[in-house]
UniProtKB/Swiss-Prot annotation:
PROSITE patterns: GLNA_1 (PS00180), GLNA_ATP (PS00181), GS_BETA_GRASP (PS51986), GS_CATALYTIC (PS51987). InterPro entries: Gln_synt_N, Gln_synt_N_sf, Gln_synth/guanido_kin_cat_dom, Gln_synth_cat_dom, Gln_synth_gly_rich_site, Gln_synth_N_conserv_site, Glutamine_Synthetase. Its EC number is 6.3.1.2. This is Glutamine synthetase 2 cytoplasmic. GO terms for biological process: glutamate catabolic process; glutamine biosynthetic process; synapse assembly. It catalyses: L-glutamate + NH4(+) + ATP = L-glutamine + ADP + phosphate + H(+). Coiled coil: none annotated. The keyword DNA damage does not apply. Its main location: cytoplasm.
Length: 369
Protein backbone atom coordinates (compact mmCIF):
# COMPACT_ATOMS: atom_id res chain seq x y z
CA UNK A 1 0.00 0.00 0.00
CA UNK A 2 1.75 3.16 -1.16
CA UNK A 3 2.86 5.89 1.22
CA UNK A 4 1.26 8.42 -1.12
CA UNK A 5 -2.22 7.01 -0.48
CA UNK A 6 -1.70 7.10 3.29
CA UNK A 7 0.25 10.33 3.57
CA UNK A 8 -2.56 12.05 5.49
CA UNK A 9 -2.91 9.26 8.07
CA UNK A 10 -0.93 9.82 11.29
CA UNK A 11 -1.26 6.14 12.26
CA UNK A 12 0.30 5.00 8.98
CA UNK A 13 3.38 7.17 9.60
CA UNK A 14 4.19 5.47 12.92
CA UNK A 15 6.92 2.81 12.81
CA UNK A 16 5.02 -0.27 13.96
CA UNK A 17 8.14 -2.34 14.56
CA UNK A 18 9.07 -0.22 17.57
CA UNK A 19 6.05 -1.57 19.46
CA UNK A 20 7.34 -5.14 19.12
CA UNK A 21 10.20 -4.57 21.56
CA UNK A 22 7.68 -3.68 24.26
CA UNK A 23 5.08 -6.32 23.44
CA UNK A 24 7.84 -8.92 23.80
CA UNK A 25 8.55 -7.88 27.40
CA UNK A 26 7.68 -10.78 29.74
CA UNK A 27 4.85 -10.46 32.26
CA UNK A 28 4.14 -12.39 35.42
CA UNK A 29 2.14 -15.52 34.67
CA UNK A 30 -1.00 -14.31 36.46
CA UNK A 31 -1.04 -10.81 34.91
CA UNK A 32 -3.68 -10.29 32.23
CA UNK A 33 -4.39 -7.18 30.18
CA UNK A 34 -8.13 -7.01 29.50
CA UNK A 35 -9.64 -4.72 26.85
CA UNK A 36 -13.29 -3.96 27.63
CA UNK A 37 -15.29 -3.24 24.45
CA UNK A 38 -18.76 -1.68 24.29
CA UNK A 39 -21.30 -0.09 21.95
CA UNK A 40 -21.66 3.66 22.45
CA UNK A 41 -24.73 5.87 22.23
CA UNK A 42 -24.73 5.95 18.43
CA UNK A 43 -25.72 2.29 18.36
CA UNK A 44 -23.07 1.59 15.73
CA UNK A 45 -19.68 2.79 17.01
CA UNK A 46 -17.50 0.95 19.49
CA UNK A 47 -15.36 2.15 22.40
CA UNK A 48 -12.72 0.35 24.46
CA UNK A 49 -10.43 0.75 27.43
CA UNK A 50 -7.94 -1.50 29.21
CA UNK A 51 -7.38 -2.75 32.73
CA UNK A 52 -4.95 -5.09 34.46
CA UNK A 53 -6.13 -8.29 36.13
CA UNK A 54 -4.12 -10.42 38.56
CA UNK A 55 -5.83 -13.66 37.56
CA UNK A 56 -6.72 -15.55 34.39
CA UNK A 57 -10.52 -15.47 34.02
CA UNK A 58 -12.34 -18.56 32.81
CA UNK A 59 -15.75 -16.94 32.23
CA UNK A 60 -17.25 -13.44 31.92
CA UNK A 61 -18.90 -13.82 35.34
CA UNK A 62 -15.46 -13.79 36.97
CA UNK A 63 -14.61 -10.38 35.51
CA UNK A 64 -15.25 -7.19 37.48
CA UNK A 65 -18.00 -4.77 36.53
CA UNK A 66 -16.37 -1.51 35.44
CA UNK A 67 -17.53 2.02 34.72
CA UNK A 68 -16.83 4.77 32.20
CA UNK A 69 -17.83 8.33 31.34
CA UNK A 70 -21.17 7.87 29.62
CA UNK A 71 -21.45 11.59 28.91
CA UNK A 72 -18.51 11.28 26.52
CA UNK A 73 -20.17 8.34 24.74
CA UNK A 74 -23.62 9.92 24.17
CA UNK A 75 -25.13 7.77 26.93
CA UNK A 76 -25.42 10.02 29.99
CA UNK A 77 -25.52 13.60 31.23
CA UNK A 78 -22.33 15.14 32.55
CA UNK A 79 -23.93 15.74 35.95
CA UNK A 80 -24.54 11.99 36.36
CA UNK A 81 -22.15 10.36 33.94
CA UNK A 82 -21.09 7.04 35.49
CA UNK A 83 -22.18 4.22 33.18
CA UNK A 84 -21.42 0.56 33.83
CA UNK A 85 -19.82 -2.24 31.84
CA UNK A 86 -20.99 -5.80 32.45
CA UNK A 87 -18.79 -8.43 30.75
CA UNK A 88 -20.73 -10.91 28.58
CA UNK A 89 -18.15 -12.63 26.35
CA UNK A 90 -14.39 -13.22 26.38
CA UNK A 91 -12.09 -13.48 23.34
CA UNK A 92 -8.36 -14.02 22.97
CA UNK A 93 -6.45 -10.80 22.24
CA UNK A 94 -4.69 -11.04 18.83
CA UNK A 95 -2.74 -7.84 19.48
CA UNK A 96 -1.10 -8.68 22.83
CA UNK A 97 -1.57 -12.46 22.63
CA UNK A 98 -0.64 -14.66 25.59
CA UNK A 99 -3.29 -14.72 28.31
CA UNK A 100 -4.55 -11.26 27.40
CA UNK A 101 -8.20 -10.91 26.46
CA UNK A 102 -10.86 -8.84 24.73
CA UNK A 103 -14.13 -8.52 26.65
CA UNK A 104 -17.49 -7.74 25.05
CA UNK A 105 -19.65 -5.78 27.48
CA UNK A 106 -23.25 -4.73 28.04
CA UNK A 107 -23.86 -1.14 29.15
CA UNK A 108 -26.09 -0.04 32.03
CA UNK A 109 -27.13 3.30 33.49
CA UNK A 110 -26.48 4.42 37.06
CA UNK A 111 -29.85 3.03 38.19
CA UNK A 112 -29.22 -0.46 36.81
CA UNK A 113 -31.39 -0.11 33.72
CA UNK A 114 -29.90 -0.84 30.28
CA UNK A 115 -28.69 2.08 28.20
CA UNK A 116 -30.75 2.94 25.13
CA UNK A 117 -28.26 1.17 22.87
CA UNK A 118 -28.03 -1.98 24.98
CA UNK A 119 -30.07 -4.21 22.68
CA UNK A 120 -28.46 -7.39 23.95
CA UNK A 121 -30.53 -7.68 27.13
CA UNK A 122 -33.91 -8.08 25.42
CA UNK A 123 -32.36 -10.12 22.60
CA UNK A 124 -31.05 -12.62 25.15
CA UNK A 125 -34.46 -12.83 26.82
CA UNK A 126 -36.10 -13.61 23.48
CA UNK A 127 -33.35 -16.05 22.45
CA UNK A 128 -33.80 -17.99 25.69
CA UNK A 129 -37.54 -18.33 25.00
CA UNK A 130 -36.76 -19.75 21.55
CA UNK A 131 -33.87 -22.02 22.57
CA UNK A 132 -35.88 -25.22 22.06
CA UNK A 133 -36.18 -24.41 18.34
CA UNK A 134 -32.37 -24.21 18.05
CA UNK A 135 -32.17 -21.10 15.84
CA UNK A 136 -28.93 -20.61 13.92
CA UNK A 137 -27.75 -17.35 12.39
CA UNK A 138 -25.05 -16.41 9.93
CA UNK A 139 -24.39 -12.78 8.97
CA UNK A 140 -22.57 -11.52 5.88
CA UNK A 141 -20.92 -8.28 6.98
CA UNK A 142 -20.13 -5.91 4.11
CA UNK A 143 -17.91 -2.86 4.62
CA UNK A 144 -15.85 -0.34 2.66
CA UNK A 145 -12.27 0.88 3.03
CA UNK A 146 -11.74 4.65 2.93
CA UNK A 147 -8.66 6.85 2.78
CA UNK A 148 -8.07 9.04 5.80
CA UNK A 149 -9.89 11.83 3.93
CA UNK A 150 -13.06 9.73 3.57
CA UNK A 151 -12.58 8.82 -0.11
CA UNK A 152 -12.94 5.14 -1.11
CA UNK A 153 -9.53 3.53 -1.00
CA UNK A 154 -7.89 3.25 -4.41
CA UNK A 155 -10.47 5.39 -6.22
CA UNK A 156 -9.19 8.25 -8.40
CA UNK A 157 -9.27 11.50 -6.45
CA UNK A 158 -10.89 13.40 -9.30
CA UNK A 159 -13.00 10.70 -10.89
CA UNK A 160 -14.35 7.19 -10.58
CA UNK A 161 -13.08 3.67 -11.21
CA UNK A 162 -14.46 1.62 -14.07
CA UNK A 163 -18.04 0.31 -13.80
CA UNK A 164 -18.88 -2.54 -11.46
CA UNK A 165 -18.28 -6.00 -12.85
CA UNK A 166 -14.64 -7.09 -12.44
CA UNK A 167 -14.30 -6.39 -8.71
CA UNK A 168 -16.48 -9.06 -7.04
CA UNK A 169 -14.14 -11.83 -5.80
CA UNK A 170 -11.55 -10.15 -8.00
CA UNK A 171 -7.82 -10.78 -8.20
CA UNK A 172 -5.21 -8.24 -9.25
CA UNK A 173 -3.94 -4.82 -8.22
CA UNK A 174 -6.37 -3.06 -10.57
CA UNK A 175 -9.39 -4.89 -9.12
CA UNK A 176 -8.97 -5.21 -5.35
CA UNK A 177 -7.47 -2.97 -2.70
CA UNK A 178 -6.19 -3.65 0.82
CA UNK A 179 -6.26 -7.44 0.82
CA UNK A 180 -3.53 -7.25 3.48
CA UNK A 181 -6.02 -5.76 5.93
CA UNK A 182 -8.65 -8.34 5.02
CA UNK A 183 -6.26 -11.25 5.61
CA UNK A 184 -4.99 -9.73 8.86
CA UNK A 185 -8.57 -9.33 10.08
CA UNK A 186 -9.54 -12.86 9.03
CA UNK A 187 -6.61 -14.39 10.91
CA UNK A 188 -7.17 -12.19 13.97
CA UNK A 189 -10.83 -13.25 14.17
CA UNK A 190 -9.89 -16.93 14.02
CA UNK A 191 -7.26 -16.45 16.71
CA UNK A 192 -9.69 -14.57 18.93
CA UNK A 193 -12.22 -17.40 18.79
CA UNK A 194 -14.78 -15.65 16.60
CA UNK A 195 -16.72 -18.02 14.38
CA UNK A 196 -15.73 -16.32 11.14
CA UNK A 197 -16.46 -18.55 8.17
CA UNK A 198 -15.05 -16.70 5.17
CA UNK A 199 -14.36 -13.48 3.31
CA UNK A 200 -14.47 -12.07 -0.23
CA UNK A 201 -14.08 -8.90 -2.26
CA UNK A 202 -17.43 -7.30 -3.04
CA UNK A 203 -19.10 -5.73 -6.09
CA UNK A 204 -17.94 -2.14 -5.52
CA UNK A 205 -14.17 -1.54 -5.54
CA UNK A 206 -12.77 -1.06 -2.01
CA UNK A 207 -15.76 -2.98 -0.62
CA UNK A 208 -15.30 -6.32 1.15
CA UNK A 209 -17.30 -8.85 3.12
CA UNK A 210 -16.66 -11.31 5.91
CA UNK A 211 -19.10 -13.90 7.19
CA UNK A 212 -19.75 -14.89 10.80
CA UNK A 213 -21.61 -18.06 11.72
CA UNK A 214 -23.49 -20.22 11.82
CA UNK A 215 -23.93 -19.32 15.48
CA UNK A 216 -26.68 -20.33 17.85
CA UNK A 217 -28.79 -17.57 19.38
CA UNK A 218 -27.15 -14.58 21.06
CA UNK A 219 -23.58 -15.59 20.17
CA UNK A 220 -23.98 -14.26 16.61
CA UNK A 221 -24.30 -10.75 18.04
CA UNK A 222 -21.32 -11.12 20.37
CA UNK A 223 -19.11 -12.52 17.62
CA UNK A 224 -20.13 -9.96 15.00
CA UNK A 225 -19.60 -6.97 17.29
CA UNK A 226 -16.16 -8.23 18.29
CA UNK A 227 -15.31 -8.94 14.64
CA UNK A 228 -16.27 -5.34 13.86
CA UNK A 229 -14.03 -4.14 16.69
CA UNK A 230 -11.12 -6.09 15.25
CA UNK A 231 -11.82 -4.69 11.78
CA UNK A 232 -11.69 -1.10 13.01
CA UNK A 233 -8.71 -1.76 15.26
CA UNK A 234 -6.65 -3.45 12.54
CA UNK A 235 -7.60 -0.79 9.98
CA UNK A 236 -6.41 1.78 12.52
CA UNK A 237 -2.96 0.19 12.51
CA UNK A 238 -2.81 0.35 8.71
CA UNK A 239 -3.94 3.99 8.71
CA UNK A 240 -7.14 3.14 6.82
CA UNK A 241 -10.78 3.81 7.75
CA UNK A 242 -13.34 0.98 7.62
CA UNK A 243 -16.90 2.21 7.26
CA UNK A 244 -20.13 0.27 7.74
CA UNK A 245 -22.15 2.98 6.00
CA UNK A 246 -24.83 1.14 3.96
CA UNK A 247 -24.42 3.50 0.99
CA UNK A 248 -20.98 5.11 1.18
CA UNK A 249 -21.05 6.27 -2.44
CA UNK A 250 -24.23 7.61 -4.11
CA UNK A 251 -24.93 6.72 -7.70
CA UNK A 252 -24.54 3.50 -9.65
CA UNK A 253 -22.65 1.63 -6.94
CA UNK A 254 -23.70 -1.22 -4.69
CA UNK A 255 -24.48 -0.44 -1.08
CA UNK A 256 -23.41 -2.52 1.90
CA UNK A 257 -25.62 -4.87 3.86
CA UNK A 258 -25.55 -7.48 6.60
CA UNK A 259 -27.49 -10.27 4.92
CA UNK A 260 -28.74 -12.56 7.66
CA UNK A 261 -29.08 -16.30 7.14
CA UNK A 262 -31.59 -17.97 9.44
CA UNK A 263 -32.67 -21.51 10.23
CA UNK A 264 -34.35 -23.48 12.99
CA UNK A 265 -33.94 -27.17 13.71
CA UNK A 266 -37.20 -27.88 11.87
CA UNK A 267 -35.98 -25.99 8.79
CA UNK A 268 -32.76 -27.98 8.69
CA UNK A 269 -34.53 -31.35 8.80
CA UNK A 270 -36.11 -33.20 5.87
CA UNK A 271 -39.15 -31.33 4.63
CA UNK A 272 -37.95 -28.16 6.32
CA UNK A 273 -38.81 -26.08 3.26
CA UNK A 274 -42.39 -25.99 4.57
CA UNK A 275 -41.18 -24.38 7.80
CA UNK A 276 -39.11 -21.92 5.78
CA UNK A 277 -42.17 -20.95 3.76
CA UNK A 278 -44.19 -20.50 6.96
CA UNK A 279 -41.48 -18.21 8.36
CA UNK A 280 -41.43 -16.15 5.16
CA UNK A 281 -45.21 -15.76 5.35
CA UNK A 282 -44.91 -14.47 8.92
CA UNK A 283 -42.15 -12.05 7.93
CA UNK A 284 -44.30 -10.70 5.10
CA UNK A 285 -46.81 -9.39 7.65
CA UNK A 286 -44.22 -7.49 9.74
CA UNK A 287 -42.14 -5.75 7.06
CA UNK A 288 -42.28 -2.21 8.49
CA UNK A 289 -41.39 -3.36 12.00
CA UNK A 290 -38.36 -5.22 10.69
CA UNK A 291 -37.19 -2.27 8.60
CA UNK A 292 -37.18 -0.16 11.77
CA UNK A 293 -35.08 -2.79 13.55
CA UNK A 294 -32.61 -3.29 10.71
CA UNK A 295 -30.55 -0.11 10.99
CA UNK A 296 -29.66 2.18 13.92
CA UNK A 297 -31.73 5.04 12.51
CA UNK A 298 -34.99 3.06 12.27
CA UNK A 299 -34.83 2.69 8.50
CA UNK A 300 -33.36 6.03 7.45
CA UNK A 301 -29.96 4.52 6.61
CA UNK A 302 -31.51 1.64 4.71
CA UNK A 303 -33.66 4.04 2.68
CA UNK A 304 -30.46 5.05 0.84
CA UNK A 305 -29.64 1.42 0.11
CA UNK A 306 -32.91 -0.50 -0.38
CA UNK A 307 -33.93 1.10 -3.67
CA UNK A 308 -34.83 -1.98 -5.70
CA UNK A 309 -31.53 -1.61 -7.58
CA UNK A 310 -28.02 -2.95 -7.05
CA UNK A 311 -29.17 -6.35 -5.75
CA UNK A 312 -31.64 -4.94 -3.23
CA UNK A 313 -35.39 -4.97 -2.73
CA UNK A 314 -37.52 -1.85 -2.28
CA UNK A 315 -37.68 -0.62 1.30
CA UNK A 316 -41.43 -0.09 0.88
CA UNK A 317 -42.38 -3.58 -0.28
CA UNK A 318 -41.87 -7.11 0.98
CA UNK A 319 -40.83 -9.77 -1.52
CA UNK A 320 -39.46 -13.28 -1.51
CA UNK A 321 -38.06 -15.59 -4.14
CA UNK A 322 -35.74 -18.48 -4.94
CA UNK A 323 -32.17 -17.41 -5.82
CA UNK A 324 -33.39 -13.81 -6.33
CA UNK A 325 -31.04 -11.20 -4.87
CA UNK A 326 -33.56 -8.47 -5.62
CA UNK A 327 -35.96 -9.78 -2.96
CA UNK A 328 -36.37 -9.05 0.74
CA UNK A 329 -36.03 -12.77 1.49
CA UNK A 330 -33.97 -15.09 -0.71
CA UNK A 331 -34.28 -18.86 -0.56
CA UNK A 332 -31.05 -20.27 -2.01
CA UNK A 333 -31.45 -22.54 -5.02
CA UNK A 334 -29.77 -25.43 -3.21
CA UNK A 335 -32.14 -25.11 -0.26
CA UNK A 336 -35.14 -25.17 -2.56
CA UNK A 337 -33.78 -28.25 -4.36
CA UNK A 338 -32.94 -30.07 -1.12
CA UNK A 339 -36.24 -29.18 0.51
CA UNK A 340 -34.52 -28.01 3.69
CA UNK A 341 -31.94 -25.56 5.02
CA UNK A 342 -32.21 -21.83 5.66
CA UNK A 343 -33.42 -18.52 4.27
CA UNK A 344 -31.57 -15.23 3.79
CA UNK A 345 -33.02 -11.93 4.98
CA UNK A 346 -31.32 -9.36 2.73
CA UNK A 347 -32.78 -6.28 4.40
CA UNK A 348 -30.45 -5.60 7.39
CA UNK A 349 -28.03 -2.74 6.72
CA UNK A 350 -24.28 -3.08 7.14
CA UNK A 351 -24.41 -0.90 10.27
CA UNK A 352 -27.30 -2.79 11.87
CA UNK A 353 -27.20 -3.97 15.47
CA UNK A 354 -27.21 -7.78 15.14
CA UNK A 355 -28.92 -8.08 18.52
CA UNK A 356 -31.86 -6.06 17.19
CA UNK A 357 -31.96 -8.11 13.98
CA UNK A 358 -31.94 -11.44 15.82
CA UNK A 359 -34.58 -10.29 18.29
CA UNK A 360 -36.91 -9.07 15.54
CA UNK A 361 -36.58 -12.28 13.54
CA UNK A 362 -37.12 -14.56 16.54
CA UNK A 363 -40.14 -12.59 17.74
CA UNK A 364 -41.72 -12.98 14.31
CA UNK A 365 -40.89 -16.53 13.26
CA UNK A 366 -40.73 -18.31 16.64
CA UNK A 367 -42.89 -16.34 19.08
CA UNK A 368 -45.52 -15.22 16.54
CA UNK A 369 -45.46 -11.67 17.88
Amino acid sequence: MSARILEDSPNARINKTILDRYLSLPLQENIVQATYVWIDGTGEDLRCKDRTLDFIPQSPKELPVWNYDGSSCYQAEGSNSDTYLYPVAIYKDPFRRGNNILVMCDTYKFDGTPTDTNKRKTCLEVANKCAAEEPWFGIEQEYTFLDFDGHPLGWPKNGFPGPQGPYYCGVGANKVYARDIVDAHYRACLYAGIKVSGTNAEVMPAQWEFQVGPCEGISIGDDLWMARFLLHRISEEFGIVSTLDPKPMPGDWNGAGAHTNVSTKAMREDGGIRDIEKAVAKLSKCHERHIRAYDPKQGQDNARRLTGKHETSSINDFSAGVANRGCSIRIPRGVNDDGKGYFEDRRPSSNCDPYSVVEAILRTICLDE
